[in-house]
Amino acid sequence: MKESQINQAFEYAKARYADLGIDVEKAVEQLEKLSISLHCWQADDVTGFENGDGELTGGIQATGNYPGKARTISELRADIDKAMSLIPGDHRVNIHAFYGDFGGETVDRDQIEPKHFQSWIDWAKEKNYKLDFNSTCFSHEKSADGFTLSHRDPAIRKFWINHVIQSRKIAEEMGRQLGSKCIHNIWVPDGSKDLTVDRLLYRKNLKESLDQIFEYKTNDDYMLDSIECKLFGIGSESYVVGSHEFYMGYGVANNKMITLDSGHFHPTEVISDKISSLLLFAPEIMLHVSRGVRWDSDHVVILNDELQALTQEIIRANALDRVHVGLDYFDASINRIGAYVVGVRATQKALLQALLEPIAQLRAYEANGQNFERLALLEEAKSLPWAAVFDYYCLKNGVIAGEAYIADIQQYEKEVTSNR
């Protein structure tokens, strides 16, 4: 796409939106400030660097066997760098605890330290990325029976408590060195395949474990904790300890950020509808944007109705400073760098559309009970020239606009990933 064509289309878009009282330049400036947290685990199918032959557990599954997945830290970072080069703006990288730079040593989860992630911090500093972090309470012998922080065995619980505390120390150090608050997310797979009698016991154990974890105080200037629920997983269809109600209650009672994952609810339930309620009670919200197809399948994010509804809720609530956007999917059936770029660009497009929404007029219609007018304008807004604005945003950031990035990824595959 020629630069002159992009600029010409952008000028038309500016004029068209101006007719509706919308400042396109301001919307672009706002989008420029929005960082999306890119999940490192798409690049290697959630394998990590503890044990390359280890099995992915925790009721999650990466399906597909597309060639070229990252096998080492250097390959994974190179793939992320490539994806970032095709995504406009400055963004974050989200790391799980079993992606440490262990130097060939066996380091158990309760023994991880900031030194095992110093090379990640150095890389992020060099590339101008910021980092987020996650405890990894799955794919480990001490999570094999499906329970971690809620385990009946106090010794098992203590192991995972120590792991999460160590993870929080790492997140704090990441935030300190990079000058940006690192969000540390806690998700545990705890649950049962079939009918569970002592449901209260496990939830009491989880609450007490979290209480012990948060007794270790961290600096809020460097890191923030977030807690994540789930409805069910493979092997935990009947009961999940960390339900939405559990974490919503714990988060509100203890002033903790709450993570909402698009795929962690019933297929007919959407997290966009939860944003406005949680904003009234929780200090902040972390989003793990995914695309579940019939279950929590973690398909690549696309520009669908729910993604648009999700970003609209954030912008309409004027909550950009309280809602953090991260991605969480892992499709092993397609080019993994392509999966990154498609998902992040889709999320950015949805955010841009929301920023360009004629919200003042829509609110006026709603307040006056003009429901036909509201519906009509919502529909017309869908076909406004937002895509021309996104192309301009790409151009402004020195990133390929339009579908031309496909060929760039194909070339990288030919030269790099196909040789693995």
Regions found by a protein language model. Give the residues of each.
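Alpha/beta catalytic barrel-like cores
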Residues: 1-152, 159, 168-169, 176, ...
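Residue-level signal for short, function-critical loop segments
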Residues: 99, 190, 231
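Active-site oxyanion-binding pockets that recognize sulfate/phosphate
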Residues: 150-157, 195-199
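Extended substrate/RNA-proximal surfaces in nucleic-acid metabolism proteins
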Residues: 168, 174, 180, 203-210
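Aromatic- and glycine-enriched pocket-lining scaffold segments that form the walls
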Residues: 175, 181-195
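Acidic/histidine-rich catalytic cores of soluble enzymes
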Residues: 195-306
